[in-house]
């Protein structure tokens, strides 16, 4: 048994990586509420220009993350996951600090791209835990870990808005850099990893990685599932506030209502992910995945017919509970169908598909709503998720038949 296969106090590592994912999720979302305001402060004027630059600085991070993730995953498989976590936390802290000092929009755009290049904390945290936790507890552990990033992402916008109101926009970037540096310190002092470095010659090439997979087709279908999950989530984001305003009519607290409806899926996922992950360890993550996808379809369709914001909020809460099972189930199936030797790359490829979904989802939602209205977005998204449910079921059925 190689050192990388020996679990070393994985429960402590799970706790520390959960805190790291929480801080990373919070740090990323701290600046999200006022990105357009900061773009404006950097000299961009005019409605069209502001919209264009805001979209660019938002999406470029995901684009560069999608490009860089496989490289960092390969390096993690060679050098170990802890060193990549340290590199990511420290690199992002420095970039966030520099963002607070940006003097023009081009500097800010380049720094947002650099943030994507240097990211990768959460996928490598997943890879670290996946290679250390006992296989029969993978679903629970990865489900629990996923709640760290979700919790941070929920808290971040609220904290970022309050900090920006009290201290201004630039100081929030400095505070965010401090949060990421704390993440670096936690990782440095408390995460333990037994890893035997692998020389570049001994590293498996992409073809060998594919050949080493137990079921390459299934792994590809899991990557596609990750992409579609993010497309489905992101397609609703651009139109949610406008749809809520259409449902609520002329009310004074539309921002509060929209914010609440935007956050309820995250709260539900936070509650459901560990429980459904544990259930997946008992009955199989493939069953959890297919059932959660079908439930998502059944909840998305009625969203296009709701008459009040509270009906939408209830459906989104239930959708969040189902969604809380999806990514952990995908990650658990990736663990089952790969080896520790290639875990970093497999999780990084999965992250690349997730980043592509983060970019294409909002574009799809905006295009559909512009052509056919808000309600059509939910129906089209339901169709995309239904396709994914059928595709995933077929891939899992083929694997089962091959085993039999």
Curated annotation (Swiss-Prot):
Q: What is this protein called?
A: Multidrug resistance protein MdtG
> InterPro entries in the record, alphabetically?
MFS, MFS_dom, MFS_MdtG_subfamily, MFS_sugar_transport-like, MFS_trans_sf, Mutidrug-R_MdtG, Tet-R_TetA/multi-R_MdtG-like
Q: Which domain of life is it from?
A: Bacteria
What Pfam families does the database record attribute to this sequence? MFS_1, Sugar_tr
What NCBIfam families does this protein map onto?
A: PRK09874.1
* CDD domains the UniProt entry points to: MFS_MdtG_MDR_like (cd17391)
Q: What GO CC annotations are associated with the protein? A: plasma membrane
Q: Which GO terms describe its molecular function?
A: transmembrane transporter activity
Protein species of origin: Salmonella typhi
Asked if the keyword Transferase belongs to this entry, the reply reads no
């Amino acid at each position: 048994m190689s050192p990388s296969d020996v679990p070393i106090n994985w429960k402590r590592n799970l706790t520390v990586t959960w805190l790291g994912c929480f801080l990373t999720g919070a740090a990323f979302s701290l600046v999200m509420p006022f990105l357009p305001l900061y773009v404006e402060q950097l000299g961009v004027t005019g409605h069209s220009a502001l919209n264009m630059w805001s979209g660019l600085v938002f999406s470029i991070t995901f684009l560069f993350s999608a490009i860089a993730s496989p490289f960092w995953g390969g390096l993690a498989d060679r050098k170990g996951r802890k060193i990549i976590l340290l590199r990511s936390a420290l690199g992002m802290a420095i970039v966030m600090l520099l963002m607070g000092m940006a003097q023009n929009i081009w500097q800010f755009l380049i720094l947002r791209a650099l943030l994507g290049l240097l990211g990768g904390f959460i996928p490598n945290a997943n890879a670290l835990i996946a290679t250390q936790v006992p296989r029969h507890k993978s679903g629970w552990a990865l489900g629990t870990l996923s709640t760290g990033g979700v919790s941070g992402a929920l808290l971040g916008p609220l904290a970022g808005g309050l900090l920006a109101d009290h201290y201004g926009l630039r100081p929030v970037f400095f505070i965010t850099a401090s949060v990421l540096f704390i993440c670096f310190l936690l990782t440095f002092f408390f995460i333990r990893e037994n890893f035997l470095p692998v020389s570049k010659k001994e590293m498996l090439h992409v073809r060998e990685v594919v050949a080493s997979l137990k079921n390459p087709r299934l792994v590809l279908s899991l990557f596609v599932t990750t992409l579609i999950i993010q497309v489905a989530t992101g397609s609703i984001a651009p139109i949610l506030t406008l749809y809520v305003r259409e449902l609520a009519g002329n009310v004074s607290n539309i921002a509060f209502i929209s914010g609440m409806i935007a956050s309820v899926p995250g709260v539900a996922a936070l509650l459901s992910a560990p429980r459904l992950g544990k259930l997946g360890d008992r009955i199989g993550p493939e069953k959890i995945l297919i059932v959660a996808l079908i439930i998502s379809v059944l909840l998305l369709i009625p969203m296009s017919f709701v008459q009040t914001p509270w009906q939408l909020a209830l459906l989104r809460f239930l959708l969040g509970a189902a969604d809380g099972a999806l990514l952990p189930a995908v990650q658990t199936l990736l663990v089952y169908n790969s080896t520790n030797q290639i875990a970093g790359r497999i999780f990084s490829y999965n992250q690349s598909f997730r980043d592509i979904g983060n970019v294409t989802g909002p574009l799809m939602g905006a295009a559909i709503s512009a052509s056919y209205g808000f309600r059509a977005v939910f129906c089209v998204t339901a169709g995309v998720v239904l396709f994914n449910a059928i595709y995933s079921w077929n891939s899992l059925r083929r694997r089962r038949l091959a085993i039999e």
